[in-house]
């Protein structure tokens, strides 16, 4: 598939991640950016409103965009609420969505799974597109077979809307698949300030840090008598996510089901 041209539409092209996705499309020979979806600048060229070379038109109407451009793949890098709507519409139009937003419920995923089966096309929803972050999650799941005590600290820029991050939640979920259930810490521990011990998922504590100067970082800390193990990943710029976006676009053309999490398409 990598030698065949893949027609792309990008939703949210002017956002920080969206700008990187436009650059990715421009420098990848077998990607053809045929349109973009935004809440403004309808029927203007991307090159007229952004420092890019693409002459693809911007659409404020997603249905019109899909009808006129006939894309193979939608790359959605918007918000959780908008991303949910775009994903469903894309599948209804026979367009394969690659989604980089979080916030999908079990009911949402079930509905989208039914749509992919009905249409016979693939969809990929990835809380994190950084390949290093995916490996961090895989390594953490491996370590959880031997270390029962674990806490997750995720650190992001101060404009991130959700906490804990989708990556932290996914990491906890993967660890829980192999970790023996255990209540960590002293059974009588008391929080002097509410929330001091962080959020909890399946007995795993999750801590969120939000500061300017950060991009996306996560540390998974394991401990047992006499030793600790720390697995950490850092994204220093948003270009770090593009290798995963590229892989997802290529892989979504080869599957006919919904995949949640990039770890499921990496051996």
Curated annotation (Swiss-Prot):
EC number: 1.17.1.8
One GO term (biological process): diaminopimelate biosynthetic process
Active-site residue list: 156 (proton donor/acceptor), 160 (proton donor)
Catalytic reaction equation(s): (S)-2,3,4,5-tetrahydrodipicolinate + NAD(+) + H2O = (2S,4S)-4-hydroxy-2,3,4,5-tetrahydrodipicolinate + NADH + H(+); (S)-2,3,4,5-tetrahydrodipicolinate + NADP(+) + H2O = (2S,4S)-4-hydroxy-2,3,4,5-tetrahydrodipicolinate + NADPH + H(+)
Enzyme class: oxidoreductase
Any one annotated GO CC term: cytosol
Keywords, ordered alphabetically: Amino-acid biosynthesis, Cytoplasm, Diaminopimelate biosynthesis, Lysine biosynthesis, NAD, NADP, Oxidoreductase
Cellular localisation: Cytoplasm
Similarity comment text for this entry: Belongs to the DapB family.
Name of the protein in its database record: 4-hydroxy-tetrahydrodipicolinate reductase
Species: Bacillus subtilis (strain 168)
Gene that encodes the chain: dapB
């Amino acid at each position: 598939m990598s030698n065949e041209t893949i027609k792309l539409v990008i939703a949210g092209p002017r956002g920080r991640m969206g700008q990187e996705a436009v650059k990715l499309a421009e420098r990848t020979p077998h990607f053809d950016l045929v349109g973009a979806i935004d809440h403004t600048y309808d029927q203007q060229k991307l090159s007229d409103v952004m420092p890019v070379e693409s002459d693809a038109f911007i659409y404020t109407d997603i249905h019109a965009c899909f009808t006129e451009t006939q894309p193979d793949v939608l790359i959605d890098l918007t918000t959780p609420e908008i991303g949910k709507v775009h994903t469903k519409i894309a599948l209804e139009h026979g367009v394969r969505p690659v989604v980089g937003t979080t916030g999908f419920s079990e009911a949402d995923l079930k509905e989208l799974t039914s749509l992919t089966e009905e249409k016979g096309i693939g969809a990929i929803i990835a809380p994190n597109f950084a390949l290093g972050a995916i490996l961090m999650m895989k390594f953490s799941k491996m370590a959880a077979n031997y270390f029962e005590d674990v806490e997750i600290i995720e650190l992001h820029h101060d404009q991130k809307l959700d906490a804990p991050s989708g990556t932290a939640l996914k990491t906890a979920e993967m660890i829980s698949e192999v970790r023996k259930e255990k209540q960590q810490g002293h059974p009588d521990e008391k929080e002097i300030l509410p929330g001091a011990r962080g959020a909890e998922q399946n007995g795993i504590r999750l801590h969120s840090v939000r500061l300017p100067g950060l991009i996306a970082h996560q540390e998974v800390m394991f401990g047992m008598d006499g030793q600790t193990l720390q697995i950490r990943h850092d994204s220093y710029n948003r270009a770090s996510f593009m290798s995963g976006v590229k892989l997802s676009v290529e892989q979504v053309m080869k599957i006919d089901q919904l995949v949640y999490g990039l770890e499921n398409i990496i051996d």
